[in-house]
A protein has these predicted regions:
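Active-site beta->alpha loop and helix N-cap motifs at the rims of alpha/beta catalytic domains
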Residues: 36-43, 49-176
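Catalytic alpha/beta core domains of metabolic enzymes, predominantly
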Residues: 174-249
Length: 249
């Protein structure tokens, strides 16, 4: 295995696609992999609701315990699957705080704090940091689309406002905004941007991100059906919807 990795296509800027399956100290990556919030499968958590439309915190507590007990590597609260875009501001903030409190440092908690309003994304991110999240998942601006340079400035503003790690979130099918590989390269130079959730579905683009950024921007699959190909491109893991149902897979 070691000889194959040295002599084959996977050079020092890449990693073994079987890294997640073998605990080989010789394959521990350098760069920002050492700063990664988690490795493996994090759950893009649903937000349980009561019939009257209020968040069901009793069920959320049960769900969090179920995830932790069955080996989930991280909890992602208020992401796309958690319907963050349809939560009120109070619901959004309360859900983040409750999750941090109930997880109680058993596994990392990552909060979705993105917005199409840069200042509001900064405020959400600062609040999430203040209540103790381990990292942030920050989607691109949506509806109000910007240029690639605008994206860089948007993420710089957020990253400069907090001290905790940030995972970029690229899902152009929902936002209408794509983070190009070249923009990923620029963003990877920012110290506390430590990964990207890539849900574009474009393996060619993901391959180019891996090639340009190497270990300075670990990639998480944002689509459950692309876990294997992304692992083969040295992916860090997955932020999974399927894990809501079966986190032990």
């Amino acid at each position: 295995m070691e000889g194959y990795l040295k002599d084959g296509l996977l050079t020092s800027s890449f990693c073994s696609p079987v890294r997640a399956f073998f605990n080989d100290a010789d394959l521990i990556m350098k760069g920002k992999r050492s700063m990664a919030i988690f490795e493996g499968a994090g759950v893009a958590m649903i937000t349980p609701m009561k019939a009257n439309g209020e968040i069901n915190y009793d069920k959320m507590a049960e769900f969090i315990d179920y995830q932790v007990d069955n080996g989930t590597d991280a909890i992602i609260v208020c992401g796309t699957t958690g319907e963050a875009s349809t939560l009120s501001e109070k619901e959004h903030l309360d859900a983040i705080e409750f999750t941090v409190s109930h997880v109680n440092k058993r596994i990392p908690v990552i909060a979705g704090t993105g917005s199409n309003d840069t200042e509001y994304a900064v405020q959400l991110s600062q609040y999430a940091e203040s209540v103790g999240v381990d990292g942030l998942l920050v989607i691109t601006p949506y509806y109000n689309k910007t240029t690639q340079n605008g994206l860089i400035e948007h993420y710089k503003s957020i990253s400069n406002s907090v001290s905790i790690p940030i995972i970029l979130y690229n899902v152009p099918s929902r936002t209408g905004m794509n983070i190009s590989p070249e923009t990923c390269l620029e963003l990877s130079k920012i110290k506390n941007i430590v990964g990207i959730k890539e849900a574009s579905g474009n393996i060619s683009q993901i391959t180019k991100i891996a090639s340009l950024c190497g270990d300075n921007l670990p990639i998480y699959s944002g689509n459950d059906d692309q876990i294997l190909p992304i692992l083969s491109l040295c992916g860090q893991g997955v932020i999974s919807v399927l894990s809501n149902i079966n986190p032990s897979l």
